Amino acid sequence: MKLAKLGVSAAAAAAALLIAAPALAHTKVVKSTPAAQATVAAPKTITLTFNEKVVPAFSSFELVMVGHDMKIPVKTTVSKDNKTISGSPTAPMMAGAYKIKWTAASADGHRMKGEVPFRVR
């Protein structure tokens, strides 16, 4: 009898984990232009594509030149499908190392942050 109750409890716990698993997923970048660690000519447009829809009001990125802590102004927009954030630098980009520092909120309100490093030749 105790063994049967234990089996039912284990099955219920496993079912709860399976149901909760999608809620534990976090917003993350699945593709970027420029790609992480790439060396490129100064990009005219920067794009970040996410694994799930993001909330436009709480999702954007900034462009920072590493070592100088110099921010390059970028006005970002979110695509109609809410999975891609794009932006064009409004100032010239010198040769050197950069980071795309992003923040994105998913539909459940959970905010994530990350960086995509790249170099301009």
Segments (PLM) and residue ranges:
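Beta-strand-rich extracellular modules
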Residues: 103-107
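Bacterial N-terminal signal peptides that target proteins for export
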Residues: 1-11
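A short tyrosine-centered beta-strand micro-motif
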Residues: 98-100
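N-terminal edge beta-strand
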Residues: 24-42
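Extended, polar beta-sheet/loop recognition surfaces of beta-rich domains
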Residues: 46-49, 109-121
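Surface-exposed, short loops/turns at beta-strand junctions within beta-sandwich domains
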Residues: 91-95
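N-terminal signal peptide c-region/cleavage motif recognized by signal peptidases
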Residues: 20-22
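Short, surface-exposed alpha-helix to beta-strand junction/turn motifs within ectodomains of secreted
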Residues: 46-47, 53-73
